[in-house]
Regions:
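Residues that define the loop-to-transmembrane-helix transition and helix capping
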Residues: 24, 52, 89, 130, ...
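Re-entrant/interfacial helical elements at transmembrane boundaries that shape
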Residues: 74-76, 109-120, 133-134, 146-163, ...
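Membrane-core helix-loop-helix motifs of multi-pass transport proteins
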Residues: 125-217, 353, 380-415
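C-terminal transmembrane helix pair
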Residues: 170-183, 314-422
Length: 422
């Protein structure tokens, strides 16, 4: 059975990488096969799906759509154009802005909020939106490790290691993960300029678009503020963030439907939710559960421990780069959850403070997702946004941006974490 599961797992990712148009159907079909084979029970499959993530996606997609229809992104676009007057500078600024926002809210939510601005600018000046939307996604993934609330993997680490919000800024008198990530972000700025090197257009001052209704923007801001506040609440229900996003979407939708001149109809707002992306993620959650059930992730972890021995630098190096490699192809959440006890055990055996290995794991697992279009939920969301605009993104297209961005950011973080904590 284990061989069958591994074969199906590999087949799924091959299809997703080579036939991106059908990836959601491949993931869903293989997930169903896993249930039929008995690798995952029907109840376990339902529980394996992270409904919090699904609800966050659906709610944010709906609210962002209404915000777009209210012309708020268009207004921001025009303000950026008038301020920077260069397509290259605007696209670089959007990527950096995406990273900043993502340090405090979910990566996927960040992409859903910032990508529409990138699309609006690309459409206005008749340039391809592919590079700018993808850099928004990879920048959001980079900064997700900066704070406790930036990414699910950070939350997993903090919960396991007993860290609080401020430990990501200063821990044991040393700079925390936040500053490591900022160093990585600074290192990627030349990469961003290289990606947009051909965008040499100078832009004339443009008339600023008027927003037709500010309520969707208020709903979006309320969503962000509520997510940040919720991050400080201990022992909150698992669905809290998802319920927040869905609540504000339903609230603003109800408000718009009741207006004489709504920014969009309720029907259009619901259809704006990217159900292909939701199906893809749901299938992946079940597949990863199946792979975990047959012990594949445990086998990989044990092999890692046997290979590393007791050389700290070797352990750290293998941990970081192995995490980058694994997270390029599978969701980093189950990987990090599995590796945290392994890292803790290694540290205990060597009598070391585990902070070095904890942050090495987080850096590698978070940034590794930027290598492939299926390595992180934010990448999948970005691909879904571009697909709706008529752009099918191949693995090669994504990797031309993701690989150099990842290598520069990981090397910077890898060196700095070692210098600070070793």
């Amino acid at each position: 059975m284990k061989t069958i599961v591994i074969t199906l797992f590999i087949l799924t990712y091959v299809i997703m990488l080579t036939l991106p148009k059908y990836r959601q159907y491949a993931a869903a079909a293989v997930a169903v096969v896993m249930v039929i084979l008995g690798v995952v029970s029907p109840l376990e499959a339902v529980n394996a799906i992270d409904w919090n993530v699904i609800m966050m996606l659906a709610g944010t997609m709906g609210t962002v759509y209404l915000c777009i229809e209210s012309k708020m992104p268009a207004m921001v676009r025009d303000m950026l154009v008038n301020k920077l007057k260069s397509v290259k500078l605007i696209f670089v600024a959007l990527a950096l802005f995406s990273g900043f926002v993502s340090a405090f809210i979910d990566n996927v939510a960040t992409v859903l909020m910032v990508a529409p601005i990138a699309l609006a600018i690309a459409k206005k000046f008749n340039v391809s939106p592919v590079n700018t939307v993808l850099t928004v996604a990879v920048s959001s993934n980079l900064q997700g490790a900066a704070t406790l609330v930036g990414d699910t993997t950070s939350i997993l680490l903090a919960g396991y290691a007993g860290m609080d919000f401020m430990d990501f800024f200063v821990i044991d008198g040393k700079p925390g993960m936040f500053w490591v990530v900022q160093a990585g972000a600074v290192a990627t700025i030349p990469i961003l300029f290289w990606i947009f090197r051909k965008e040499k257009n100078r832009i004339e001052t443009t008339e600023i678009t008027k927003v037709t209704d500010f309520m969707p923007t208020y709903a979006l801001l309320a969503t962000v503020i509520s997510l940040v506040i919720a991050s400080f609440i201990p022992n909150k229900p698992a669905l809290t963030n998802g319920l927040i996003c869905v609540f504000f979407f339903i609230a603003v939708l109800r408000y718009e439907v009741g207006r004489d001149e709504p920014v969009a109809t309720g029907h259009d707002a619901v259809l704006a939710i990217d159900f292909d992306t939701l199906l893809l993620l749901s299938g992946l959650f079940v597949i990863i559960q199946a792979v975990t059930n047959v012990g594949l992730i445990d086998d990989i972890s044990n092999a890692f421990v046997n290979m590393a021995g007791d050389n700290l630098f070797k352990i750290y190096t293998i941990l970081v780069w192995f995490s980058v490699l694994v997270s390029a192809f599978i969701d980093n959440i189950p990987y990090v959850a599995t590796m945290l006890p392994v890292v803790s055990g290694i540290s205990a055996q060597l009598g070391l403070d585990p902070t070095l290995l904890y942050f090495g794991l987080l850096a590698g697992a978070t940034l590794g997702g930027n290598i492939t279009p299926v390595g992180a939920s934010a990448n999948i969301a970005a691909g879904g946004i571009l697909k709706k605009e008529g752009y099918e993104i191949s693995a090669g297209q994504f990797m031309r941006i993701g690989v150099p961005f990842t290598l520069v950011a990981v090397v910077a973080g890898y060196v700095l974490i070692w210098l600070i904590y070793a």
